[in-house]
Amino acid sequence: MGSLAMKPVPNKWIVTFPYGVTYKGTRKKHKGVDYSCPKGTSVNSAVSGKVVFAGWHKVGRGWGRSYGQHIIIDNDRFKDGSAGLWAGYCHLSKINVKVGERVNAGDQIGEVGSTGNSTGSHLHFEIQSGRLWKGWAGSRNPQRWIDA
């Protein structure tokens, strides 16, 4: 069986901080996967869908300030038929899409950076379910779809 979503960065870049791991021994779990890549590395949409956010939240929680410049895409449907999932691409140096724009899986949507709460250039890729941000309860392991 092939993957259900595309990897958001070129294949030579691997996950350097996996889903679910605690950060420095804290109880706060990592809600996505991090790919350590140089600034400017192409970020491609893992799924087809509609851009529902593209920019930098100034205030708030969730997909907020800690993610720096980021994009949220509401997927049409994953190949397994599941719906109600959206993908977040965070810490970007450049955003190439606008809210309301439709993208296809594989389209370049931005470039890797180190904006927001970041200690170095990388892409934080996150999947959330439902229509509202639910923190850990709404997060899903992105590797489930990429490695399927």
Residue ranges and their predicted role:
Residues 42-54, 97-112:
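Short, well-structured beta-strand-loop connectors
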Residues 4-7, 80-84, 95-107, 126-148:
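Acidic, glycine-rich catalytic/binding loops that coordinate metals and/or anionic ligands
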Residues 23-26, 42-43, 61-63, 80-81, ...:
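Short glycine/serine/proline-enriched coil/turn segments at secondary-structure junctions
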Residues 34, 72, 88-91, 111, ...:
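Conserved beta-strand positions that form and line the central face of beta-propeller blades
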Residues 35, 70-73, 104-118:
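Short hydrophobic beta/alpha edge segments that flank linear recognition/processing sites
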Residues 20-22, 40, 56-59, 76-78, ...:
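Short beta-turn/strand-loop junction motif enriched in small, turn-promoting residues
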Residues 14-47, 56, 129:
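Short glycine/threonine/proline-enriched tight-turn/helix- or strand-capping micro-motif at secondary-structure
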Residues 45-96, 121-129:
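Zn2+-dependent peptidoglycan hydrolase active-site motif and core
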